[in-house]
Amino acid sequence: MTETKNADAGSVITDHVTLRYDYAIGEVAGRFMQGLKDGKILATRCSKSGLTYLPPRSYCERSFEKCDSWVEAGLEGVIETSTIVVRGFEGMRKAPVAIAFVRLDGTDSAIANYVDGLDLTNYETAMKRIAPGRRVRVEFAKAREGRITDFSFVCVD
C-alpha cells in the first residue's frame, strides 16, 4: 500500500504558464475590428429605440430587437469614468497607465481604452485631466491590425 502525503494548507506551487487562445470574434466584433483597421470607430444602432451602441452590440438592451444599422462614431467624446492603473500586467503596457470609459459623440454607451499623452508622475494632477466630463479625442495608431489597441484617447483641453 502506498502512503500519500497531503501538502500543507499553506503550500504554494510556483509555475509559469503560457497559453495561446484563439477564438472566433463573430460578425459584430469582426466588423468593428475591421473598422479599427480602416481608421474608423463603428457602432451599431437600433432604429426602434434610437440607441447607438459602442462597443457595438447585436441586440438592443432597451427594445430587445436586433441592431439594424451601422454608424461611424464621432472621434471626440466625454469621459464617463477613469482610473490610473499602477500595477502592470505581463504582456501589457508598462504601468502606470491611464484608462477611461468614453462616450464618443453620437453614441449612447461608453468604450474603454488607454488615455495617452498624460504626465503620470503626479497622479492627482493626472486624475484631474481625466475626470468625468472632460473631453478626449480618438488617436489612431500609425500601423493598425484590427485590434482594440489600434486607438487610444488623448485629452482635448
What kind of feature is each model-predicted range?
Residues 77-79:
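Conserved hydrophobic positions within beta-strands
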Residues 40-43, 50, 57:
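Residues immediately within or flanking Cys/His clusters that coordinate Zn2+
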Residues 47-50, 63-64, 107:
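Short Cys/His-rich metal-coordination motifs, predominantly Zn2+-binding knuckles/fingers
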Residues 82-88, 107, 143:
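Short, conserved beta-turn/loop elements at beta-strand boundaries and strand-helix junctions
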Residues 1-41, 150:
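A broadly conserved sequence feature marking short terminus-proximal activation segments
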Residues 119-137:
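Short nucleic-acid-contacting surface segments enriched for D/E, G, S/T with interspersed K/R
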Residues 139-157:
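OB-fold/S1-family single-stranded nucleic acid-binding modules
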